[in-house]
């Protein structure tokens, strides 16, 4: 007695554990999970993060740039001091200096200045002497290697709108990234909805196949009793056996299809294929048509509009390349040892850069303008395509609603027919095969009905995706 209780307790524990660890997922939960874990969504999110960082970087592109410039330079030939170029100035200056010195000394001694004649003689004599001894060559500076280092600051003052356009382009690229992320989430939600509908369809068909198999098994048992009573021949019992075997095979196939459908759903959700997931929801037999709305929220159109904004900003940048650039510059040299020419340690100034001739400029402008026109055409084409798809989806919903209602009537009639054939068999007015045929027809009408429901709910999910609201399908599917 104790052992039986223990076995029962273990069995109950295992059943409860299986229930706890096998999660029941709703469509809304599946969509939320996929939008967090799906690789396509993650990739779009990473792209958006990159654009956010680039946008943040462009906010500082108007600040000055500070660079450390340092270099070791080796000159191929020694530097030469060009004394011949400054000879006249040196000779003239030295002669004048000699006259000034002699005149100063004479004035201090005598109190009078030298006569102009004497000054001229001193000037000419000094000039002749200096000219005679002045080198007639350019002397070399033996040091040929130099190390220089300093800080250079460059502050943009006017760049012809390049900075503003650059920030605007980065902002448009950020918006494109946001739109692309939303587009990725929309297509993921749509794919999840389609796969979830497929799982619900298989749940419904598995239930109907189980009911059909149960009826086939009862029919087989009834045929066995009739055979034992020698009321029917053996071949009619064989028909019942074959029908039951086919029913079992169909059930196994449906169960395997559901398992594969769950694998696909897990992959779309970005979770492990080994994670236990169970979905027992069946197709909603309601075919309520939603209020029809415009397609202005379509993600593809929004993405193309963002691309057009990028193209327009790119055109502004291309045009700004023909405008001048003005910078404030500063340079501080803190390491300039052994330079042959003594230069100031720092300088400040303005730098103007203006490309006066660029043979590619006109072609680039035309290409940028063409890109904007191309974006307009793509938006127009996509808008027409979306409008057409929306109208077709609306008509499909109406048509499939009517079709499913017709198939619903047919399957109910098939139920009545099966029941009548079974009663006739019980009264020996029909055969076992007649019942099997009626059950098969009943199953086929069920399949047609649920296939029409799948088509309707698929069209409904497609309609919401086209109009830019794919998650609205959760209002019609649990």
Question: In which residue ranges do the predicted regions lie?
Answer:
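Bacterial Sec-pathway N-terminal export signals of envelope proteins
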Residues: 20-80, 231, 266-312, 383, ...
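Amphipathic alpha-helical coiled-coil scaffold segments and their short linker/junction regions
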Residues: 31-37, 87-134, 271-328, 473-478
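Sec/SRP-type N-terminal targeting helices
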Residues: 42-46, 59-60, 157-185, 211, ...
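Periplasmic alpha-helical coiled-coil/stalk elements that build and connect Gram-negative outer-membrane
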Residues: 53-55, 179-297, 396, 400, ...
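Acidic, low-complexity, intrinsically disordered peripheral segments
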Residues: 67-69, 74-99, 448-478
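Residues on the lipid-exposed face of transmembrane beta-strands in outer-membrane beta-barrel proteins
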Residues: 72, 151-155, 265, 350-354
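Transmembrane beta-strands of outer-membrane beta-barrel pores
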Residues: 72-76, 157, 332-336, 354-358, ...
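Short segments within alpha-helical structural elements
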Residues: 246-271, 412-469
């Amino acid at each position: 007695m104790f052992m039986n209780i223990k076995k029962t307790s273990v069995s109950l524990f295992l059943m409860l554990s299986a229930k706890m660890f096998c999660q029941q997922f709703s469509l809304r939960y599946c969509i939320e999970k996929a939008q967090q874990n799906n690789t396509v969504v993650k990739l779009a999110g990473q792209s958006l993060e990159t654009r956010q960082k680039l946008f943040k970087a462009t906010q500082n592109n108007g600040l000055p740039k500070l660079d450390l410039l340092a270099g070791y330079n080796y000159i191929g030939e020694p530097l030469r001091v060009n004394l011949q170029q400054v000879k006249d100035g040196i000779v003239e200056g030295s002669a004048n200096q000699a006259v000034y010195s002699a005149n100063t000394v004479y004035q201090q001694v005598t109190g009078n200045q030298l006569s102009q004649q004497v000054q001229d003689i001193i000037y000419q004599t000094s000039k002749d002497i200096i000219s005679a001894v002045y080198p007639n060559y350019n002397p070399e500076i033996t040091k040929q290697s130099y190390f220089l280092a300093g800080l250079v600051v460059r502050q943009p003052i006017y760049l012809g709108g390049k900075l503003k356009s650059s920030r605007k382009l980065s902002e448009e690229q950020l918006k494109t990234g946001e739109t692309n992320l939303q587009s990725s989430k929309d297509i993921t939600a749509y794919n999840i909805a389609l796969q979830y509908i497929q799982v619900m369809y298989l749940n419904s068909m598995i239930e109907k196949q189980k009911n059909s198999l149960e009826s086939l098994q009862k029919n087989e048992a009834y045929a066995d009793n009739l055979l034992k009573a020698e009321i029917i021949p053996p071949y009619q019992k064989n028909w019942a056996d074959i029908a039951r075997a086919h029913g079992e095979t169909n059930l196994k196939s449906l169960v395997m299809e559901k398992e594969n459908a769950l694998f696909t759903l897990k992959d779309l959700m970005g979770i492990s294929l080994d994670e236990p997931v169970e979905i027992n929801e069946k197709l909603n037999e309601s075919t309520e048509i939603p209020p029809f709305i415009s397609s202005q929220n379509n993600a593809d159109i929004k993405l193309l509009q963002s691309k057009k904004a990028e193209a327009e900003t790119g055109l502004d940048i291309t045009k700004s390349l023909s405008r001048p650039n003005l910078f404030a510059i500063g340079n501080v040299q803190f390491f300039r040892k052994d330079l042959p020419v003594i230069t100031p340690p720092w300088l400040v100034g303005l730098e103007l850069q203006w490309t006066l001739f660029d043979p590619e400029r006109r072609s680039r402008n035309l290409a940028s303008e063409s890109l904007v026109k191309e974006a307009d055409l793509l938006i127009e084409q996509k808008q027409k395509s979306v409008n057409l798809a929306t109208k077709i989806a609306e008509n499909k919903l109406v048509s499939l609603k009517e079709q499913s209602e017709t198939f619903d009537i047919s399957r109910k009639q098939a139920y009545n027919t099966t029941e009548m054939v079974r009663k006739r068999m019980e009264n020996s007015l029909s055969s076992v095969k007649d019942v099997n045929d009626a059950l098969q027809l009943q199953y086929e009408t069920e399949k047609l009905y649920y296939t029409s429901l799948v088509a309707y709910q698929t069209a409904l999910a497609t309609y919401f995706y086209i109009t830019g609201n794919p998650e609205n399908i959760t209002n019609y599917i649990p």
